[in-house]
């Protein structure tokens, strides 16, 4: 996790954000609570620079396994209410990675988040990595199942700064990092590509070239 001082502002976009809601039967008012949201991109089959991914970004209402970067040595809890309120801020945010896969580098943006969902205690995300621009990512992640994720925040509010475990009651997501799972503050995070791995795709393309010559 990484905390930033500035707040990322959303801009106007022709892309549509699609919320998914469920009815709270226990609520006397029958209120609707958002638990998922997605940005609908036009489908482009075989796009050379869009490689779908999915992952578990963090856990909600659960203390982190270790202190994240910027938390001054404190483990943290992101409340479900805070995560739900901040869900729209994840859409359109970048995913990044750091050489060594052990932290954050917000300047090394390699993909985009297009959907986010609260599934029980898991906050899951999906989107695209820019596989043509960053071929090393597909080569690395297409053959490794040990990857996780870590969120980046701005304007995080802590309920009690004196507490041993900080409870985050409000925040804005500004991005996420792909990193080794054992380097993430939460061990239960995950990251995986949802497409044919790079080596297999290269083999298929090479076979097609041989057939055409």
Predicted regions located by residue number:
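A glycine-biased structural micro-motif
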Residues: 73, 86-96, 120
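Generic structural motif
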Residues: 44, 56-65, 81, 98-100, ...
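Residue microenvironments linked to proteolytic maturation
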Residues: 114-206
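A broad, low-specificity signal marking well-ordered, structured residues that form hydrophobic/aromatic
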Residues: 51-55, 93-95, 123, 149, ...
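Short beta-strand and beta-hairpin "edge-sheet" elements
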Residues: 19-41, 100-121, 159, 164-181
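Short conserved beta-strand and strand-loop elements enriched in small hydrophobics
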Residues: 89-103, 149-151
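Polar/acidic, low-complexity leader/linker segments enriched in S/T/G and N/D
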Residues: 1-88, 201-211
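Short low-complexity stretches enriched in small and charged residues
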Residues: 74-85, 101-110, 130-135
